[in-house]
């Protein structure tokens, strides 16, 4: 199973003003660094908990349907499955009808159940593509407050420890981070 992001989030869960307040910097001199740190912190939180925070597009590639034709989706919360495509004997894409599959977006990880007889692929590798939209919503306010706070905690920590040195290895994740994200972790597939 391979999955890639096709449409990155349009905004970050926290604003530059939020980050400035967290690191107690009033000037705009550090804005470029803070912007990079916000993006890196969001990505770190997303990888840690296996969730998309802000609405984003994903594509999942499968060689074949798993047993029971139930696909455990690698990112959650899933807002919608936008398409399921298989490839015929000539290598041409064939889109499945939405009635051929059901999304369980409540489970974590989310699951996609494909009905028996729907869409077998003739390709031996990456013959199935699933396009989906995931995330809590389009705005930072849609993201749960503990996850936004975890991002700000990382931003402040990395801002303070931005110089590589002896202490950098022991100071990679700040105290309190794990407690903020613990309730949002999705078990590994």
Annotated model-derived regions:
Residues 1-189:
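Divalent metal-cofactor coordination and adjacent catalytic microenvironments
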């Amino acid at each position: 199973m391979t999955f890639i992001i096709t449409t990155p989030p349009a905004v970050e869960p926290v604003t530059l003003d939020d980050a400035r307040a967290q690191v107690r910097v009033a000037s705009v001199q550090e804005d470029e660094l803070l912007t990079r740190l916000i993006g890196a912190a969001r990505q770190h939180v997303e990888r840690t908990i296996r969730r998309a925070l802000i609405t984003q597009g994903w594509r999942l590639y499968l060689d074949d349907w798993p047993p029971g034709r139930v696909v455990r989706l690698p990112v959650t919360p899933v807002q919608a499955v936008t398409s399921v495509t298989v490839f015929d004997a000539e290598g041409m894409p064939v889109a499945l009808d939405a009635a051929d599959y059901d999304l369980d977006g409540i489970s974590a990880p989310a699951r996609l159940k494909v009905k028996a007889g729907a869409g077998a692929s003739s390709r031996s590798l990456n013959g199935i593509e699933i396009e989906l939209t995931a995330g809590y919503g389009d705005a930072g306010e849609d993201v749960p407050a503990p996850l936004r706070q975890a991002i700000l905690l990382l931003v402040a920590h990395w801002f303070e420890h931005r110089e590589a040195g002896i202490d950098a290895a022991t100071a990679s994740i700040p105290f309190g981070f794990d407690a903020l994200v613990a309730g949002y972790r999705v078990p590994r597939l």
